[in-house]
């Protein structure tokens, strides 16, 4: 999906849902212009989310639910389409399960979530003179850093998986020797006993000999 130059989401109090959805769009298109409002302009040309009853708005019936019963919010709806292109299908699913679903659940049901609470604290207090949009984009900047690290970590696992798969294919006598210490043992799924060796473990063995 090509990200357009303009995005529109709801104004007023913001939540982790619309904040992380905005962060995702900024990661994919850093120059995107996000506008907040209470009504989507009739002539708006761009992506609309968390408002407007479109593809990326969960405030409509019938609601969309995951197979495990967790309802989608805007962030989850966007990630379902855009996430696999960033980290691949498997890692996109894992990020959804472990990171996004708790945020979506909070937005839809009020289920307690510390990260959602932290993002919510960026909203100006009742007697503040701060501009609400400015506060929103401060929260987006923080969410963007968190999401960027999620994506970076997921792609690091993808790279490690490739290394381990290659090492497994080159294994001899049940010994898998990886060129570096990496988080990839979970890809060794064949029912074959494996002895893992890395440069670090080999060096440790030499020192103890």
Predicted stretch roles:
Residues 105-183:
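Hydrophobic, aromatic-enriched interface-forming segments
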Residues 166-209:
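Gly/His-enriched, cation/cofactor- and phosphate-binding structural elements
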